[in-house]
């Protein structure tokens, strides 16, 4: 059985990046929540 995590910078950015978050209402809520908590990094 292969490992489930096969790292790829491109896929990481597309799925969890700032622009991916910004594109949906839920994603914007995630960013807002992370800003409210004072997170240094908002997204991948």
UniProtKB/Swiss-Prot annotation:
The lineage of its organism: Bacteria, Pseudomonadati, Pseudomonadota, Alphaproteobacteria, Hyphomicrobiales. GO terms for molecular function: structural constituent of ribosome. HAMAP family: Ribosomal_bL34 (MF_00391). Keywords: Ribonucleoprotein, Ribosomal protein. This is Large ribosomal subunit protein bL34. GO terms for cellular component: ribonucleoprotein complex; ribosome. Belongs to the bacterial ribosomal protein bL34 family. GO terms for biological process: translation. Residues 10-19, 31-44 have a biased composition (Basic residues). Pfam families: Ribosomal_L34. Residues 1-44 are annotated as: Disordered. It comes from the Bacteria. InterPro entries: Ribosomal_bL34, Ribosomal_bL34_CS. It comes from Afipia carboxidovorans (strain ATCC 49405 / DSM 1227 / KCTC 32145 / OM5) (Oligotropha carboxidovorans).
